[in-house]
């Protein structure tokens, strides 16, 4: 699985998250008009109208935040009926309508699964339908079974159930560390493994910074001795996709010291000149 950035939809989602409440309804309607299909699919208009579980999960979160149950149910129905992998209880990460088999890649993307499960928990809290929380519990159970492992002294969530545990290392994506969701799962289940995952994720982030910016690369290798390095199969850089890292940290703890290098680096640029990526070698 080689994930491509979904910058158009991601950028709009980020703007929705930080839109003043008085404008949130209008922003949500604009977002739906641009990316939401009547069948419940979120399309990446900058990438051949493909869909990803991350986009579905984020949209489900936004539907809950906007008290839009009708849209939420369409999103969830399409996701569950089209992307669900019945063999492991997770979701195919990508849907490409141009292919004969739109879900040819049968791997999952753990961040998408996490976002979907988290949105379902929030849906139950808002609309008092235990069917949502039951579905969420099934997804989190599947994530623990297929994506969460203990490696080199850390509890980690692999980016996908296949292809990220190699002979002498595992590959991690720090932008998949959805801390507030992991905390919500811990509160829901009372399982310590979710708190361990969050704690170890923070420990790893403290050590992942490199280069002039002291920021982690998009993909990171963790070897059996606990050594961290940029993963070999990807460019050694931090791209726009990784802006999710400080977002999730801030959602979890707005005063976290882990935000310091992000503020220091991006604070030096005018908003219109924010770099799309940072090469750790420069």
Language model regions located:
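Aromatic-rich carbohydrate-recognition surfaces in CAZymes
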Residues: 52, 56, 103-125
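Active-site-adjacent structural elements in enzyme catalytic domains
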Residues: 74-78, 121-122, 134-142
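Low-complexity, Ser/Thr/Pro/Gly-enriched N-terminal "stalk/linker" regions
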Residues: 21-54, 64-98, 103, 152-153, ...
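Bacterial N-terminal signal peptides
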Residues: 9-17
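Residues in the short coil linking paired helices within alpha-helical repeat scaffolds
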Residues: 68, 129-132
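Short glycine/serine- and small hydrophobic-enriched flexible loop segments
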Residues: 60-65, 115-125, 180-184, 247-251
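Extended ligand-binding clefts on enzyme/binding-domain cores
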Residues: 25-26, 49-53, 110-111, 133-281
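Bacterial N-terminal signal peptides that target proteins for export
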Residues: 1-9
């Amino acid at each position: 699985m080689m994930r491509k950035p979904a910058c158009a939809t991601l950028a709009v989602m980020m703007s929705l998250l930080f839109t003043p409440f008085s404008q949130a309804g209008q922003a949500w309607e604009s977002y739906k008009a641009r990316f939401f299909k009547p069948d419940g699919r979120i399309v990446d208009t900058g990438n051949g109208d493909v869909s990803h579980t991350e986009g579905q999960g984020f949209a489900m979160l936004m539907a809950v935040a906007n008290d839009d149950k009708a849209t939420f149910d369409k999103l969830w129905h399409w996701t569950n009926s089209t992307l669900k992998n019945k063999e492991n209880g997770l979701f195919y990460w990508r849907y490409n309508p141009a292919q004969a088999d739109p879900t040819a890649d049968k791997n999952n993307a753990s961040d998408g699964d996490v976002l979907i499960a988290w949105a379902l928990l929030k849906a139950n809290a808002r609309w008092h339908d235990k069917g949502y929380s039951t579905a969420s519990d099934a997804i989190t159970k599947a994530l623990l079974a297929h994506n969460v492992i203990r490696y080199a002294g850390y509890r980690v969530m692999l980016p996908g159930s296949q292809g990220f545990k190699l002979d002498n290392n595992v590959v991690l994506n720090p932008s998949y560390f959805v801390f507030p969701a992991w905390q919500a799962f811990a509160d829901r289940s009372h399982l310590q493994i979710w708190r361990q995952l969050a704690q170890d994720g923070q420990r790893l982030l403290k050590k992942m910074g490199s280069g002039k910016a002291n920021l982690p690369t998009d993909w990171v290798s963790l070897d059996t001795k606990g050594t961290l390095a940029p993963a070999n199969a990807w460019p050694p850089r931090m791209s726009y996709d990784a802006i999710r890292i400080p977002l999730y940290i801030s959602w979890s703890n707005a005063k976290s010291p882990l935000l310091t290098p992000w503020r220091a680096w991006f604070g030096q640029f005018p908003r219109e000149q924010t770099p799309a990526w940072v090469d750790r070698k420069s």
